[in-house]
UniProtKB/Swiss-Prot annotation:
Pfam families: ABC2_membrane, ABC_tran
Keyword Nucleus: no
Record's protein name: ABC transporter G family member 24
The organism of origin for this protein: Dictyostelium discoideum (Social amoeba)
InterPro entries, sorted: AAA+_ATPase (IPR003593), ABC2_TM (IPR013525), ABC_transporter-like_ATP-bd (IPR003439), ABC_transporter-like_CS (IPR017871), ABCG_transporters (IPR050352), EGF-like_dom (IPR000742), P-loop_NTPase (IPR027417)
Gene3D superfamilies linked: P-loop containing nucleotide triphosphate hydrolases
Biased segments, Basic residues type: 785-795
Location(s), subcellular: Membrane
One GO process term, biological-process aspect: transmembrane transport
CDD domains attached to this UniProt entry: ABCG_EPDR
Domain ABC transmembrane type-2: residue ranges: 902-1154
Molecular function per GO: ABC-type transporter activity; ATP binding; ATP hydrolysis activity; ATPase-coupled transmembrane transporter activity
Record-annotated ABC transporter domain positions: 454-707
Length: 1159
């Protein structure tokens, strides 16, 4: 044995020298690290040498007699143990118990007290009946002989250790990895494993003691062992209140903390000391050891707290608040977490409930200011014990909290019940109110078809045109100038004129759509001003036929019927109305054909035009406005359409309709079908009256001065009256004939009055046709006139004699037919005329200079007034409720998605493909720093960027359908809010919710992200929220952008800025302070932080740098390096939800107030 010891010393010296030289050669610039590495490897080498020695002895025993140990009867225990380990047997023979012992570890995993558990370890049982391991007189050290770790050599007074332990007292395990985290068992037995078996370490406590470190008393006998005083004056107090020195042994029940420890249930030992039993005055100190496993070792970190005070909370719960905190990590923490734990300062709080659980434990809560920045308050389940010397006086009991528990509970119950009752009452009341309003709407009987006469008086309109680079030059442009007229029901009224004459502007003003420019004048319906309900009794067909091309004609009209017909009308009646309109406009043959898109041809142009008219006829409007109904149609289609319109005006089953339309230069066939004509040129009215009178009016101007033969010849060759009328207006010589006509009109029998009202109003008033307005009002036939003396006029550069007509009969004859507008100053011509007419003998000889004016003469019979004027009853602005409009628009949008599935299919295919690709590239990432953490972070960044940029497709949502929305909203189809909500819902659910879920579901487990259903759900929520925020932002941009290119450019620019400041490409610590606001407004920073925190907060990361022993770091350390806050998981979700609401609200405001057709 002496020879062996000498060889051992020689071997150790040689080995240590070789390792030292090798390390110095490899890393000569870092001697300290090399020395540490040498010490660690030397201990391993020593352990290996110890193994070789045991193996040598075992082989020698087996060599002497191979069959000697087959029945395990005579082999010494130490030798048998060594043989068992070397042979790999599952048991060994214990000679003291004379039985075979299985080499397993078992016991109650959830037991806080290890005193009652039987924990076995490889090679030696921890079960003990005698805990008196005191040194003997011959051996100054214990040698842990009872435990079989060593025995005292009385000759040398030293301990001789067995094969598994070393040290002066044989307390150190031969494997150094099992010594640094050795627990202080306070008289109990510490059970470490041997060799490299990953078995639990724990304290086996003596009778009467319990807890992780055997510091909790179970009874009075335990107090005697703990205090070393075997008198009977010590009593064990198991309440959660701390009097002098209380010990708590706790199990951590926090899922987050245990998740950080690789889902191992952590434990904590807490001790608090106070100098006296006075509960209210003295301050004390506390300490805490946080262990990795439920039964203790290894130690994670420990903390000391000072300036601690005890208080009693409601419910008699105890709270210990300490002002100062100091914490230290063990080597188990890792480098990064060591720095974080060492920085712990500030207040710490330890609270325990007065009520105990059935197993005798209490529910407690530990929180610390610095730790709370990374983790919330840590819930604990603790057993407690304190040994109190009653001989020195009983401690002061804790005070009673002022508010009794029962009273507080009843107060909560009363308040909660009251609030709940009030809330329930309000909810029921709101539901009842909404239901009542809906029933009132459904039961409301609207008026039948209204026969309406439309009249307009003194309609003028001008706009300010800006020019120049900066638009500073403003020029006023006259669009309409004092236009008057009457449109009777049952007739076609045509607004005719060349392009730019003001036809569409007048049509827009009459229909209430004109929203640009300054407008003067009055528009009356049956003598009453136009109200908000005008949309319900009128329809407007624009020049452009814009419909959803994927729908059929019947579907298009059915959606219009569902939106514009009353809700009390049954679905069957609405379907009959659709079929009737289709038949009325000759669309039955193509009723089930698609309308057609730019990619796929559908119905013809004429059929589309008739479909646009049919859309407005669904509600049987009293007044129908049509802008250029024959535009783009051939002569046959145009004639057929005008014929249909004439039938609709005069042959309605519910009453006559008033139809007003604009037209350029119709054919003779079309012109003959008009009932009334309003002629405009350059904004000025030239005629307003019956269509047949217009031809005679302009012919008499044309043939004035011709011989009778020339007049007959001219009438014979007149082919198209419309062409003739337009040519008369544009002819430079027209004013010469107009002047002649005005001079001779009094004697013409064509202008004899047929109105008794006007005839009875005959008087001797003088009328100047150029300076006065005679309005044929169908309701009172009042004539406004004024006498002017010695007025002269200049017509397009032609001077004519002034008119001084004193014949009252002539005046009365003309009042029924002439509609003259006021004299308007022409600012473009400043010629002034001085006319000395010697024939005006009844007037003064004074001569007045006047500004040049156009001859505004509007002539014709405006039709007899209605015998009885039908008043417009109570008609609501919209025929259907908000929810009806919402569901109908939702259904139409979804149907459009199904009929045009390319975008939907492409989106789903891309997300499935990307999910599989990411799963393949990042397959089962390991839980290490590189590539595990790097690739996890990269995969999350890629998904965030993909979903954000993929949401640019939302730009089409409101931009492509903008014209349809403007037209339908203007026609009273729906509210802006109902349309907006329907479009948002039908876009977000199929395009922003389902695709991210598909993407995340495919790649989550393929990548190997954190297991657990909650973590998976949080991950999907982050993807959905990110996609929805990006989509909402694009919606807001598209609603306000004038062009699609502008919306696209702004969206991409913002997405790139947000991508740069999301925390992946640019570290937050390196962002300048004046740009840090971009981080807070970047939705990607929140969208990326959620999955990162969800993944790394609780992930145990292996750090394995080259040439060093691998260590483990908490995921919190990684989060701190990238600037992520682990406590912002739910806060980030709330922020993203707020951004969604904010962007959508902004988009709605833009859509409601800024998106409109400027006419």
């Amino acid at each position: 044995m002496i020879i062996f010891k000498n060889n051992e010393i020689r071997f150790n010296s040689i080995l240590k020298s070789i390792l030292l030289l090798l390390l110095l050669f490899i890393n000569g610039n870092n001697c300290k690290t090399a020395q540490q590495f040498l010490d660690e490897n030397f201990n391993h080498a020593l352990f290996r040498e110890h193994q070789l020695e045991k193996e040598y002895k075992t082989k020698q025993l087996v060599k002497d007699d191979p069959n000697m140990y087959s029945d395990w009867t005579e082999v010494p225990a130490a030798t048998a143990e060594a043989v068992t380990i070397m042979r790999g047997d599952d048991y060994y023979y214990d000679y003291d118990k004379e039985q075979k012992i299985e080499m397993i570890v078992f016991g109650s995993e959830n037991a806080i007290s290890s005193g009652s558990a039987q924990n076995y370890w490889y090679g030696q049982t921890c079960e003990a009946t005698n805990f008196n391991n005191t040194p003997t007189t011959t051996c100054p050290n214990d040698c842990h002989s009872y435990w079989g770790q060593g025995q005292c050599n009385e000759t040398s007074s030293t301990c001789i250790c067995n094969y598994f332990f070393i040290g002066d007292d044989c307390s150190e395990n031969v494997d150094p990895q099992h010594n640094w985290d050795k627990m202080n068992c306070n008289g109990g037995r510490y059970c470490p494993p041997i060799y490299n078996y990953p078995t639990p370490r724990s304290c086996v406590c003596p009778p009467g003691q319990a807890g992780l470190e055997c510091t909790v008393c179970l009874n009075n006998e335990g107090c005697q062992a703990l205090t070393g005083n075997y008198s009977s004056s010590f009593e064990c107090n198991s309440s959660p209140y701390t009097y002098f020195e209380k010990s708590y042994s706790c199990v951590v029940t926090s899922a987050e903390v245990n998740g950080d420890l690789n889902n191992s249930t952590a434990s904590a030992s807490i001790d608090c000391q106070f100098p006296g039993g006075n509960y209210n005055t003295q301050t004390g100190v506390c300490s805490m050891n946080l262990y990795y496993r439920i039964h203790g070792s290894p130690l994670y970190f420990n903390c000391s707290f000072t300036e601690c005070d005890r208080t009693i909370l409601p419910g008699q719960n105890q709270s210990i608040v300490c002002q100062n905190s100091v914490c230290n990590c063990t080597t188990y923490c890792g480098f990064i977490l060591d720095g974080l734990i060492s920085a712990v300062t500030g207040e710490a709080t330890f609270e325990c409930g007065a009520q105990t659980n059935p197993d005798g434990t209490s529910n407690c809560l530990f929180s610390q200011y610095t730790i709370n920045q990374m983790l919330p308050a840590i819930p604990l389940q603790c057993m407690s014990g304190e040994c109190i010397d009653v001989a020195t006086g009983a401690p002061t009991p804790p005070p009673i909290y002022p508010v009794p528990v029962a009273s507080m509970s009843f107060l909560y119950i009363y308040v909660g019940s009251g609030v709940g009752f009030i809330g329930l009452t309000l909810l029921i009341g709101a539901i009842f109110l909404i239901f009542s309003l809906q029933e009132d709407r459904k039961n409301f009987k609207e008026d039948t078809h209204l026969v309406c006469e439309l009249s307009f008086h003194n309609i003028s309109c001008y706009v300010n045109e800006r020019s120049g680079f900066f638009g500073k030059d403003v020029k006023r442009k006259q669009i309409l100038d004092n236009v008057n007229g009457v449109c009777p029901p049952g007739q076609l009224t045509a607004l005719m004129g060349l392009s730019g004459s003001g036809k569409t502007s007048l049509l827009d003003i009459l229909s209430g759509r004109k929203n640009v420019g300054n407008i003067d004048g009055k528009v009356l319906i049956n003598g009453a001003p136009v109200g908000k309900n005008f949309k319900r009794i009128s329809g407007y067909v624009t020049q452009d036929d814009i419909q959803i091309g994927t729908l059929t004609c019947r579907e298009h009209l059915m959606f219009a019927a569902l939106l514009k017909l009353p809700e009390n009308m049954s679905l069957e009646i609405k379907q009959q109305r659709v079929a009737s309109v289709l038949e009325e406009l000759g669309l039955t043959r193509v009723a089930d054909n698609p309308i057609g898109t730019s990619e796929k041809r559908g119905i013809s142009g004429g059929e589309r035009r008739r479909l646009s008219i049919a859309t407005e006829l669904i509600v049987d409007p009293s007044i129908l406005f049509i802008d250029e109904p024959t535009s783009g149609l051939d002569s046959h289609s145009a004639s057929e359409l005008i014929t249909k319109l004439k039938q609709l005006a005069n042959n309605s089953t519910k009453g006559q309709r008033t139809i007003i339309f604009s037209i350029h230069q119709p054919s003779a066939e079309l012109f003959e079908q008009f009932d009334n004509l309003i002629l405009l040129h350059q904004g000025n009215p030239y005629f307003s009256g019956k269509r047949e009178d217009s031809v005679n009016y302009f012919i008499k101007q044309k043939i004035a001065g011709m011989t009778e033969f020339e007049q007959q010849n001219y009438r014979m060759h007149l082919k198209n009256p419309a062409d003739f009328i337009i040519s008369m207006v544009t002819d430079k010589n027209c004013q010469r004939f107009n002047s002649t006509y005005v001079d001779s009109r009094v004697a013409s029998p064509f202008y004899q009055s047929t109105s008794p009202a006007l005839s009875s109003n005959s008087n001797n008033s003088d009328i100047n046709l150029n300076h006065h307005r005679i309005i044929n009002n169908p309701h009172n036939q009042n004539i406004h006139h004024q006498q002017h003396h010695h007025h002269h006029r200049h017509i397009y550069g032609i001077n004519g004699p002034s008119i001084d007509n004193n014949d009252s009969d002539s005046d009365s004859d003309e009042r029924d037919h002439l509609l003259a507008s006021d004299n308007i100053n022409n600012n473009n011509n400043n010629n002034k005329v001085k006319n000395n007419d010697n024939n005006n003998k009844n007037n003064d000889d004074d001569v007045e200079d006047i500004e040049e004016a156009s001859p505004i003469i509007v002539v014709g019979n405006q039709g007899e007034p209605l015998a009885s004027h039908i008043k417009i009853g109570k008609v609501e602005e919209y025929a259907t409720s908000f929810w009806t409009q919402f569901f109908v628009v939702c259904r139409r949008s979804l149907l459009n998605y199904m009929r045009n599935p390319f975008l939907l299919r492409t989106t789903y295919f891309v997300h499935i493909f990307v999910g599989l690709t990411l799963g393949y590239l990042f397959w089962k990432l390991p839980a290490n720093l590189e590539p595990g953490c790097q690739n996890r972070f990269g995969a999350m960044f890629f998904m965030t960027a993909l979903l954000s940029f993929g949401s640019i497709t939302s730009l089409d949502l409101f931009y492509n359908d903008r014209i349809i929305f403007i037209r339908e909203r203007a026609n009273g189809f729906y509210r802006t809010s109902a349309y907006f909500l329907a479009k948002v819902v039908t876009d977000i659910i199929p395009m922003r919710v389902i695709p991210p879920i598909i993407l995340g579901s495919i790649c989550y487990y393929m990548i190997g992200l954190r297991p657990g259903i909650l973590h998976f759900i949080y991950f999907l929520i982050s993807l959905v929220l990110t996609s929805t925020v990006a989509s909402s932002m694009c919606m807001a941009i598209s609603t306000i952008s004038p062009t699609f290119g502008t919306a696209n450019m702004v969206s991409i620019l913002l997405l790139f800025v947000f991508l740069l400041f999301d925390g992946f490409l640019l570290a937050r610590s390196s962002i300048p302070k004046y740009l840090i606001g971009l981080v807070w407004i970047s939705f990607m920073s929140y969208g990326l932080e959620i999955p990162v925190v969800n993944e790394f907060n609780g992930l145990w990361i292996e750090y394995n740098p080259p040439n060093t022993r691998p260590t483990y770091a908490d995921g919190l350390e990684f989060l701190s390096t990238i600037g992520a806050n682990p406590n912002r998981l739910f806060t980030d979700m709330y922020v993203l939800l707020g951004m969604i609401v904010g962007y959508l609200l902004l988009a709605y405001v833009f859509l409601r107030f800024l998106v409109r057709e400027y006419r």
